[in-house]
Amino acid sequence: MPEETQTQDQPMEEEEVETFAFQAEIAQLMSLIINTFYSNKEIFLRELISNSSDALDKIWYESLTDPSKLDSGKELHINLIPNKQDQTLTIVDTGIGMTKADLINNLGTIAKSGTKAFMEALQAGADISMIGQFGVSFYSAYLVAEKVTVITKHNDDEQYAWESSAGGSFTVRTDTGERMGRGTKVILHLKEDQTEYLEEQRIKEIVKKHSQLIGYPITLFVEKECDKEVSDDETEEKEDKEEEKEKEEKESKDKPEIEDVGSDEEEEKKDGDKKKKKTKEKYIDQEELNKTKPIWTRNPDDITNEEYGEFCKNLTNDWEDHLAVKHFSVEGQLEFRALLFVP
């Protein structure tokens, strides 16, 4: 483990924050990503979702031999949470998570074998979208974020938080915030000119374009408003009831019981006079974005013509039925499965 560049003496009750320097090649890569203009910055979301999918694959594979691995969370999913007020976009998965050592090594101090090769490719004019092929896709977050916070929980370790504004160093600390059963939360603090990635339609567009066939559900959480009709005096309802109760108690002591035959009519008239007004009420809307599943992985005998048709329409945005489909696989030195549609 690398030596810390800073030691902070703090009281035991405060969080201990450790600061580490980025490995030289990673620092150069981040500088290149931040300071070079790229038109297709949207690929950051594809890469982070792909990382989440890989983490979910890992915990799923481990659970095949040890089902108790999922005791910290049975559901395997990815959530996308835009927050316009805080100007953050959060990607949450219930994957394998990272230990403290994973955070330090994987996100900064040990360069991947493809780091240098990717930098050379970028400088030679390669497209930034190739970043995932070189094992450094996490750093694509800095295409749109000025600061990134990673909160993670692995079954074998405590919950930790990693944070960096790409200034040559990053911090790691024990996280005492909201508890995670298991998984990773990547919080992107977006740049002022990148807030388009907080818009519901923009996120849906990117997921459909790049991540539609991810094997785990991707759910978008969006805060919305709806109109709620309330009466003018609804907010004062409690006070009115208390006053009425006090009045009734006082009258019951001072007067004999007399039936008021006109009280019902007066009450009905009073209710009819109450005016209604509309107020805005906020709620969180949840929508699964990748309902189209990779049907080529299934047995062709189990797939109906309707399922083939729905898959083709979602993939091509065509409203007409396809003419024919061929679903086949090849096994040998090279193995693959394929779907061939004739429109």
From Swiss-Prot:
Q: Which Pfam families match?
A: HATPase_c_3, HSP90
Record-listed ATP binding positions: 51, 93, 112, 138
The ranges of region (Disordered) come to 227-285
Return the Basic and acidic residues bias intervals: 247-258
Which SMART domains does the protein's record reference? Answer: HATPase_c
Q: Name one GO cellular component term.
A: perinuclear region of cytoplasm
Q: Which UniProt keywords apply?
A: ATP-binding, Chaperone, Cytoplasm, Hydroxylation, Nucleotide-binding, Phosphoprotein, Stress response
Cysteine pairs forming cystine bridges in this chain are none
Where is this chain primarily localised? cytoplasm
Instruction: From the UniProt record, give one GO term of the biological process aspect.
Output: cellular response to heat
Entry GO MF terms? ATP binding; ATP hydrolysis activity; ATP-dependent protein folding chaperone; unfolded protein binding
List-wise, which residues carry Phosphoserine?
A: 263
Q: Which Gene3D superfamilies match?
A: 3.30.230.80, Histidine kinase-like ATPase, C-terminal domain
| InterPro entries the record matches | HATPase_C_sf, Heat_shock_protein_90_CS, Hsp90_fam, Hsp90_N, Ribosomal_Su5_D2-typ_SF
Location of the protein in the cell: Cytoplasm
Residues annotated as carrying N6-(2-hydroxyisobutyryl)lysine in the record are 112
Q: Where are stretches of biased composition, namely Acidic residues? A: 230-246, 259-268
Q: Which family does it belong to?
A: Belongs to the heat shock protein 90 family.
Quaternary structure annotation from Swiss-Prot or TrEMBL? Homodimer.
What biological function has been recorded for the protein in this entry? Putative molecular chaperone that may promote the maturation, structural maintenance and proper regulation of specific target proteins.
What name has this protein been given in UniProt?
Heat shock protein HSP 90-alpha A2
Question: What organism is listed for this UniProt entry?
Answer: Homo sapiens (Human)
What lineage does the source organism belong to? Answer: Eukaryota, Metazoa, Chordata, Craniata, Vertebrata
